[in-house]
Amino acid sequence: MNKAKKNMKFLPTIVAMMMALCANAQERSEVVLNSWSFSQDGSEWQQVAVPHDWAISGPFDKRWDLQRVAIVQNGETEATEKSGRSGALPWIGEGCYRTTVDIDALPGFAELVFDGAMSEPTVYVNGRRAGYWAYGYNAFRVDCTEFLHSGSNAIEVRLKNVEESSRWYPGGGLYRPVRLLTAGKTHIDDWSLYIRTMSVNDGVAHVEAEGRVAGAQPDMTATMTLEGPDGSRTESDRLSIGADGKFYATFKVKDAQLWSPESPSLYRVVTKVIRNADGPRGGELVDSKTLKTGLRTVSVSREGGFRLNGISRKLKGVCLHHDLGPLGAAVNKAALIRQIRLMKEMGADAIRTSHNMPSTMQMEVCDSMGMMVMAESFDMWIYPKCKNGYARFFREWAERDITNLVLNHRNHPSIVMWSIGNEIPEQWSEEGRQISVRLQGLCHVLDPSRPVTQGMDRPDDAVRSGFAKVMDVPGFNYRVHKYDPNFPLLPQGFLLGSETASTISSRGVYKFPVVVSDHAVYPDGQCSSYDTEYCSWSNLPDEDFRMMDDRSWTIGQFVWTGIDYLGEPTPYDEYWPSRSSYFGICDLAGLPKDRYYLYRSQWNTREHTIHLLPHWTWPGREGEVTPVYSYTDYPEAELFVNGKSQGRIRKSIGENRNELSLDRYRLRWNEVRYEPGELKVVVYDADGRQAGEQTLCTAGKAARIRLQADRTSLQADGNDLVYVTVSLVDKKGNEVPTAADLMQFDVSGEGAFKCVCNGDATSLESFVEPQMHLFNGKLVVTVQAGQHEGTLTLRVTDKTNRRVKPAVMTMDVKK
């Protein structure tokens, strides 16, 4: 690097953006800072768009954060080498982001709002340290009023990630949005606004609201207005502002449209501060803030279990880590929408943000799409699970982190409970019980409207110590055999499966013979998609279904996990190459595994499910036993191979924790012998009437490329994404399930190649190079919209089989 480049700190070719802000006393301005320059560990500066994950480009390498540890949570007692535990990507190191902001007139107030920065961010404004936050997952605010001046202002954020600080892939950098808020000296404190529904009676919602005005003067008052989704308005009286700047309002909203997963109605809340409201012109507007929320009630009790809007329901939830697969940790609205849509179509109605604070963008998506949320905070407290984890900060920062979590997110109707921890080692101790009481109490002070929980993986110890007894919602992680003996000892009268299943599978992989096993591993680093393999501490989905169905006092579950994530490649923690999980109901690319349809058959009550497995293309297995399963909500089915019946069977209820319990939720033909041709299942309803069928055919040679997009057009904002599933089909249109061809991607027009993923946990191919091999016949390529209207074109070429013609897809990009 030459000297000139070293000195190019804030030149226009390097800095992220130049913008003009004018902040009069009456004007509030909020600008998203999305264009920055970035350098890692002293490397050359490059321009990047924020949100940005500095590590996702790779390359994969087992030396990144190579950990030699015993994973106590998994029951390990001896340390072994864990090569892919945190994703095998280069997230460790120091990074620096810089941008500039032009200000014409100095505002009375200015703050930088970070939705998360990985990690230990230190913020500088015009060379002066303005703020710091320890926890990379939390939102925080930096008051920079005194550091700004007229003209160009330099903003710098320095971050540091250290080794052995995470049990999964954390990402690195400014991976969530950064905003600059400017307002007058007198302004509404955004996080002070709090709207909660106290009760709903005969269609009338009783709502309380509050807020605080910084720099309030005696001649000022406030007003609040609730605007319904149908255009209805409910206005407050003129609100007095106390000496402490606080104001309070109550509303009676008639014909309230309540928020729920089935009907996610949202209200706009407009808050205004007025000076001299009795003046000749009706007063002067000092500040105004608009937010969205929903009206709904949440409660838990011995009598009703979990209730939303007064109606008892069992949570059908999944755990989701924060990474977005090939996008890494960098948050993206289109990617989040796709995740939530996949889970809702499966029938899920809740997610758990394991094991950390969620992004604001994710909560907004859950609000608008109707997905309940358990918003989690910590994976550890005082005692570390990894050498340099959050335990370093807990004593000093825990209360501040809980405060920011709750204040930042308490107006999101999707959040139905807070979680203060996951599998905390202190759960056996009096110290742990006291910390639970303290953190739960803080949540109650900041938000009395929601219950608090945490996930406990040592139920006997947690109950004995009182750790589980003091929680609003006792949550057990796995150990379904511990539910019955511990439930009578819990004073709450109900129990949540805060983390369940941990069944492992690889999409499109089937192992023979089929075994039910808690320790199965194979030389290829894959797991069987017959969904009969799990971990030593966990279980199969069927056991959780049985517990939810047969125990009235269970209030639901959160499955580990809804989608595969980077890092934690159990059961191949010691295997290389393996760098992402096998737990997902969907793979890392977001493609449903067979298990998706098992959950769908139990959870999606709006649509029927008929799903056959495995695929029916097995050259070399002719005449060999190849079991066939069907996942369906129907109770009975008959299977045919080339027209020959393999038997008509019904689901049966089993009471024991053994293989027979599978037959309660699955239809299984275990003695089918493979022969090429047609596999067909015919399903019957409870009255024995034929209700539907599904057919699989043996695939021939690949004849063409099939492209299936998850949407028909994109928004020209430079951020929107389309996910295109790429597969090979034969001349009859049958997918070739074993295809592993190398596919190449070219994007032209108003869009660009973003990333690609095939869901193979053992693949070391780059996510950001425009080519990748199919994994078991499929992959997903992601294309990003440009900033101008027009058309984008995706061209996919099979580099392995030149006889297959390239496939082309076009898509409109609209403003």
Language-model-detected regions and their locations in the chain:
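Extended carbohydrate-recognition surfaces in non-catalytic/accessory domains of CAZymes
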Residues: Q26-V113, S165, G171-L174, T186, ...
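An acidic-aromatic loop/edge-strand motif
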Residues: V32-S35, P51-D53, P59-D61, L66, ...
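Accessory beta-strand-rich segments of carbohydrate-active enzymes
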Residues: W36-S39, G87-D190, A216, P229, ...
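Extended substrate-binding grooves/exosites of carbohydrate-active enzymes
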Residues: D53, S57-K62, R128, P177, ...
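Short, hydrophobic beta-strand segments
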Residues: C144, A249-L258, L667-R673, V768-Q787
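Extended acidic/polar, glycine-enriched regions
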Residues: H149-S152, E210-S301, W669, E675-P676, ...
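Beta-strand-rich structural segments
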Residues: A209-R212, K272, V628-T632, V682-V683, ...
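Short flexible loop/turn segments that cap and initiate beta-strands
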Residues: D219-T223, E262-R268, D633, L639-R650, ...
